[in-house]
Amino acid sequence: MVEQVCAKLKRECYRVNITRQTDEDDLLGGFRLINGQTVWQDGPVVTAMKQGGVLLLDEIDLGSANLMCLQPVLEGKGVFLKKIGQWVTPAAGFTVFATANTKGKGSDDGRFVGTGVMNEAMLDRFPVTLEQPYPTKATEKKILVKAGCDDADFATHLTAWSEIIRKSFYEGAVDEIVSTRRLVDIVNAWQIFGDKSKAIAMCLARFDDDTKEAFLSLY
């Protein structure tokens, strides 16, 4: 959503995909060997600060304690690049967003393997938390049409089907869910193979047999 809003507003967006290995060098910058010379290169965080851009820390709950180097940045202050002795002050418009499937609390059920409980001090530096629900059926249908689904009935059926599955998931009746991304995958598979049932079955194949059969029967 952040990238789409930035595109709409014509704002520069710097996306960083966070992993357990992401460290200060990846984020703030470091020395790189270029044409035989050791040259300092700003990282995406510093670049976004200087340009007054939007910084998107994607899947931040996959990171480690190395992310604590971002504390002053999240406070809205500048950051000191100790390797080159330079202080960087954020330009006007600089904004930080982060996405996290677990809201920084980790995953006890194993659905988001690799995530961990984030440092509470870092979480406290994000003043606003927004939960992004799935789109309405009308909006989701538009997404599928834009993805290339030229069969209105198929798009309507897919969105109604996914809504039933999501309701069942939230009520605890099923353990899996069909996301908007997976619906788009179904549309793409249908465009390739020309068979709706095959496309749905292929995109549900990642689930266990019982879940797959239950979802297919719902359709």
Where do the PLM segments sit?
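C-terminal regulatory/interaction module of P-loop NTP-utilizing enzymes
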Residues: 1-219
